[in-house]
């Protein structure tokens, strides 16, 4: 909720949208059925519900249970924070949420204590001038976000030469860049190469791995896990979790020396699934036929023009089960827990950072600053400079490095699809990437 952020300000001058938290996933099963597409699903984990939109028309009881648990937890943390900053009881805040104040006169937000007063947008600049004692006729210098970022960029480096690297691993974990969008996300081969460079750079004394990922390719997750493990042999590695670090996002995090999460971080989701479409029904509808000549039994394995036979299903489920066992083993080793203990909190279930700390999946609650403090302490250094990786390209370089067709297509799709562009990217990634996925069951938008 936007009010959770604004409530921390010294004064609030706006009508508040305050209505609670909801998670409302889309389900595609009936649509796929109408066009003759069947999703063949293989998974391990009762709560691993990423496949549900393709094979069901509503949430399973297990998924409904976990979603209810974590949105209730997040809402509880939001209301506690707003209660403290605005001096309003949690009970009152829930009453206000149920009243849908945004449909009432704006003065109602002031009466309820969610805002301090009302002010027109055009009057904000003059109000700020009064606060900083500038005459109304004088210019009010305002720093934009870009200006503030440049201020940090121009801070002189510490003379010690010590570097604490903050490596940002954000987005879907993939085996290779997606052609669906202009954003690459966490591309396995690139991240591994970058982490190897950080390992070999003697000036880098510690690494904070900032993970903000719902997961993705199980293969790429395993490769990145190994790269993080190798990096850890040379210098401290601290994971700082963002909005979510779940499934594959947790996979690449679990081996770190210390894991720091926000109370509202979505993490865990220790589970694996595979999902492959069978389009035979569609091809029958439109009059397409299919034939094959092969040298060996499984030569056309994975062909979406036909359903899997029983042998192929058994092979796939065996691979998924083995992948899950490896995932659990990695978590047990990284967290210094038994496999049995991990299995009790795995099954694909998502946890908030607050609960994950109680379960032993994370070590500390806090943000990236706390992770940096821990990294510096473990490295045993005093003077240091924080450097962000991977280096961000400017817009022109990024454009020149992008295939023109892909860039133009992605921008056109983004403008046409609007809020559904993210779902399109997810579907496209599922089509292009490996069939075995370690991914969070959903996208959560808090409104």
Where do the PLM segments sit?
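Charged, glycine-interspersed solvent-exposed loop segments at helix/strand-loop junctions
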Residues: 29-129, 280, 284-365, 369-375, ...
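Non-cytosolic juxtamembrane linkers/loops
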Residues: 124-125, 130-210, 214-224
């Amino acid at each position: 909720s936007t009010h959770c952020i604004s409530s921390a300000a010294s004064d609030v001058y706006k009508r508040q949208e305050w209505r609670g938290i909801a998670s409302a996933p889309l389900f595609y099963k009936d649509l796929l059925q109408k066009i003759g597409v069947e999703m063949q699903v293989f998974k391990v984990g009762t709560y691993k519900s990423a496949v549900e939109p393709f094979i069901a028309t509503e949430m399973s009881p297990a998924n409904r249970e976990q979603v209810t648990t974590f949105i209730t937890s997040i809402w509880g943390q939001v209301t506690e924070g707003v209660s403290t900053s605005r001096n309003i009881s949690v009970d009152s805040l829930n009453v206000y949420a149920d009243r849908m104040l945004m449909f009432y006169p704006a003065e109602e937000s002031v009466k309820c204590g969610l805002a301090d007063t009302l002010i027109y947008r055009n009057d904000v600049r003059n109000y700020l001038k009064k606060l900083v004692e500038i005459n109304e006729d004088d210019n009010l210098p305002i720093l934009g976000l870009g200006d503030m970022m440049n201020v940090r960029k121009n801070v002189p480096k510490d003379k010690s030469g010590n570097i604490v690297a903050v490596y940002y691993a954000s987005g879907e974990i993939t085996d290779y860049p997606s052609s669906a969008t202009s954003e690459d996300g966490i591309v396995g081969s690139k991240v591994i190469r970058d982490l190897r460079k950080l390992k070999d750079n003697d000036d880098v004394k510690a690494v904070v791995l900032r993970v903000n990922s719902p997961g993705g390719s199980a293969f790429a997750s395993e490769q990145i896990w190994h790269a993080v493990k190798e990096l850890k042999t040379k210098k401290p590695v601290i994971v700082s979790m963002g909005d979510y670090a779940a499934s594959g996002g947790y996979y690449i995090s679990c081996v770190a020396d210390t894991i720091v999460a926000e109370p509202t971080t979505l993490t865990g989701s220790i589970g694996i699934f595979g999902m492959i479409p069978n389009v035979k029904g569609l091809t029958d509808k439109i009059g397409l036929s299919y034939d094959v000549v092969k040298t060996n039994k499984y030569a056309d394995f994975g062909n979406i023009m036909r359903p899997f036979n029983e042998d192929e299903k058994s092979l796939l489920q065996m691979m998924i089960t083995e992948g899950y066992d490896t995932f659990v083993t990695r978590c047990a080793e990284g967290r210094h827990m038994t496999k049995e203990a991990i299995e009790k909190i795995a099954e694909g279930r998502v946890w908030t950072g607050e609960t994950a700390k109680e379960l032993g999946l994370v070590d500390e609650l806090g943000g990236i600053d706390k992770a940096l403090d821990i990294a510096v302490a473990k490295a045993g250094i005093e003077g240091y400079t924080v450097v962000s990786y991977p280096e961000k390209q400017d817009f022109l370089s990024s454009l020149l490095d992008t295939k023109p067709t892909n860039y133009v297509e992605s921008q056109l799709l983004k403008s046409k699809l609007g809020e559904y562009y993210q779902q399109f990217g997810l579907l496209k990634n599922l089509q292009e990437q490996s069939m075995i996925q370690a991914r969070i069951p959903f996208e959560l938008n808090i409104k």
